[in-house]
């Protein structure tokens, strides 16, 4: 189903001698298409919901700081919490954990790759767990 999101976020970075600690707080707003899906665009309806996401990231520089292509070990954990319509947190949605590497080829091109585990709450006491290898290639214009 179709989903459109927009968000606001705050990021706070703490540089370390051979690494970085980063905290990100994101307020996410979601417009999700209601089921059943409609072929006729004029009949489509969307629901609105919000959630808070908090990510804590630790990066450790594995190479010398002056190398042309630095490689970092990256560990993060991100928790997703649903908000009710008046903005009060009310329930766990999902959790992402990641262990991998970040390779900075130059100022514009970065590759992150590693193991990610996603825990998603389906209903009370029913959690779906997905384990996967994730590759993310970012090119800044």
Where are the regions that the model predicts?
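Predominantly the C-terminal beta-signal and adjacent terminal strand-loop region
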Residues: 75, 86-87, 92, 96-141
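Membrane-spanning beta-strand positions in outer-membrane beta-barrel proteins
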Residues: 11, 20, 55-59, 72, ...
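Residues on the lipid-exposed face of transmembrane beta-strands in outer-membrane beta-barrel proteins
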Residues: 8-14, 25-27, 52-62, 99-103, ...
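Transmembrane beta-strands of outer-membrane beta-barrel pores
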Residues: 14-16, 27-33, 77-83, 117-121, ...
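Repeated loop/turn-to-beta-strand initiation elements of outer-membrane beta-barrel proteins
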Residues: 17-21, 65-71, 105-113
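Hydrophobic/aromatic-rich structural module bridging two neighboring secondary-structure elements via a short loop
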Residues: 1-20
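Extracellular loop and loop/strand-boundary signature of outer-membrane beta-barrel proteins
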Residues: 39-46, 84-87, 121-123
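Residues that define the transmembrane beta-barrel architecture of outer-membrane proteins
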Residues: 2-6, 46-54, 91-97, 129-133
């Amino acid at each position: 189903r179709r989903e459109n999101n927009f968000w606001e976020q705050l990021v706070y970075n703490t540089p370390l001698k051979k690494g970085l600690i980063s905290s990100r707080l994101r307020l996410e707003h979601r417009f999700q298409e209601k089921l059943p899906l409609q072929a006729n665009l004029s009949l489509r309806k969307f629901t609105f919901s919000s959630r808070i996401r908090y990510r804590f990231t630790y990066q450790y520089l594995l190479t010398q700081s002056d190398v042309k292509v630095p490689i970092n070990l990256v560990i993060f954990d991100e928790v997703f919490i649903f908000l009710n319509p008046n903005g009060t947190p009310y329930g766990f949605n999902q959790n992402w954990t990641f262990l991998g590497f970040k390779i900075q080829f130059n100022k514009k091109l970065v590759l992150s790759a590693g193991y990610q585990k996603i825990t998603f709450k389906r209903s009370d006491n029913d959690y779906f767990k997905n384990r996967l290898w994730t590759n993310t290639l970012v090119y800044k214009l």
